[in-house]
C-alpha cells in the first residue's frame, strides 16, 4: 500500500513537471513568432517555475491520489496565463501583438467555466482544485490590469490588486476569513472583470468607450467586495455577543466542577482521619 501511494504521488508530481515543460514550450513558440525580448522570457520562466513550485508543494501537503481532469484543465489555463504574462512583460519593451494577446486571454477565460463543470461532472471537486482555479483567475486579472493601465492609467491596477489586498487584510482582521454565502452576483462580477479588461485591452472601442468599460469593472468590483466585507463584519459582530454570553456559563460550570472535586477530596480526607482514630483506639 505504501509503495502504491508513493507511485501515485510521483505520477501527480510528474504532471506538474509536464505542465512546466509545456509552459516553456509555449514561451519558445511565442519567442520565435514575435521575437520576444529578455523581459518576456524572464517573466514567463519565472511564472512557470513559481507555478510548478507552489503547485508541487500544495500537492505534497494534500497528497491526492490523482491530479484529476479538472486540475488538468486549470493547469492548461495557467499555461495560457503564463503566455499572457510574458506578452504583457514584453509589451514594455516593444509593441505587443494584440491579436495574439487577446487570443490567449480569450481561451483562458473560456476555459474558466470548463474546469468547474468537469470537476462536478467527474466528482473530483477538491479544495485544492478550487483554490488553484481561484489563484489562476486572480493572477490573470492582475496581469490584464497591468496591461490596460498602460493605456488608461495606474488606477486600473486597483482591479487586479483588490483581491490580494483583501487577502492581506484578512491577516490582520481574521473575521474576513469567515466563509461567505453563495452569491450569483459575486460570480457575475468576477466573470465581468476578465471580459471588461480583455475588451479594453483589445482596443476595439474609442478611448472613452474603453474608459467606461474599465470603470464599470472597477465599480462593480468595489461594490461586490464592499458588500462582502460589510456582511462579514456584521456576522462577526453577531457572533461576539453569543460568545460573551456562553463564556460566563462555561466559567461557572468549571468553577462548580472545581468545588465538587474539592468537597469530595475533603470528605475523603475526613473519612481517612476517622478511620485512623478508630484504629488507634482499637490498638489501645
Predicted feature descriptions by range:
Residues 1-71, 134-260, 275-284:
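A feature for the membrane-embedded catalytic helix bundles of lipid/isoprenoid biosynthetic enzymes
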Residues 41-55, 72, 78-126, 208-222:
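Membrane-embedded alpha-helical segments that form the functional core of polytopic membrane enzymes
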Residues 79, 110-118, 131, 135, ...:
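Active-site His/Glu-centered metal-binding helix of metallohydrolases
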Amino acid at each position: 500500500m505504501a509503495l502504491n501511494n508513493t507511485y501515485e504521488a510521483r505520477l501527480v508530481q510528474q504532471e506538474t513537471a509536464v505542465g512546466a515543460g509545456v509552459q516553456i514550450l509555449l514561451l519558445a513558440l511565442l519567442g520565435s513568432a514575435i521575437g520576444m525580448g529578455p523581459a518576456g522570457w524572464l517573466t514567463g520562466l519565472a511564472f512557470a517555475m513559481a507555478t510548478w513550485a507552489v503547485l508541487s508543494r500544495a500537492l505534497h501537503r494534500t497528497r491526492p491520489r490523482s491530479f484529476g481532469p479538472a486540475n488538468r484543465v486549470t493547469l492548461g489555463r495557467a499555461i495560457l496565463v503564463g503566455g499572457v504574462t510574458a506578452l504583457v512583460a514584453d509589451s514594455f519593451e516593444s509593441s505587443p501583438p494584440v491579436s495574439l494577446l487577446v487570443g490567449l486571454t480569450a481561451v483562458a477565460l473560456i476555459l474558466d467555466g470548463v474546469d468547474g463543470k468537469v470537476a462536478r461532472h467527474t466528482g473530483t471537486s477538491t479544495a485544492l482544485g478550487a483554490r488553484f482555479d481561484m489563484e489562476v483567475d486572480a493572477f490573470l486579472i492582475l496581469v490584464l490590469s497591468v496591461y490596460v493601465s498602460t493605456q488608461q492609467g495606474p488606477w486600473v491596477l486597483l482591479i487586479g490588486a483588490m483581491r490580494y489586498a483583501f487577502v492581506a487584510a484578512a491577516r490582520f482582521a481574521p473575521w474576513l476569513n469567515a466563509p461567505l454565502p453563495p452569491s450569483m452576483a459575486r460570480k457575475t462580477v468576477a466573470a465581468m472583470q476578465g471580459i471588461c479588461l480583455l475588451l479594453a485591452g483589445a482596443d476595439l472601442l474609442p478611448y472613452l468607450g474603453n474608459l467606461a468599460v474599465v470603470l464599470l469593472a472597477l465599480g462593480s468590483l468595489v461594490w461586490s467586495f464592499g458588500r462582502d466585507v460589510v456582511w462579514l463584519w456584521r456576522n462577526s459582530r453577531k457572533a461576539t455577543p453569543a460568545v460573551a454570553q456562553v463564556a460566563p456559563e462555561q466559567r461557572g460550570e468549571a468553577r462548580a466542577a472545581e468545588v465538587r472535586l474539592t468537597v469530595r477530596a475533603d470528605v475523603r480526607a475526613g473519612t481517612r482521619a476517622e478511620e485512623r482514630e478508630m484504629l488507634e483506639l482499637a490498638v489501645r
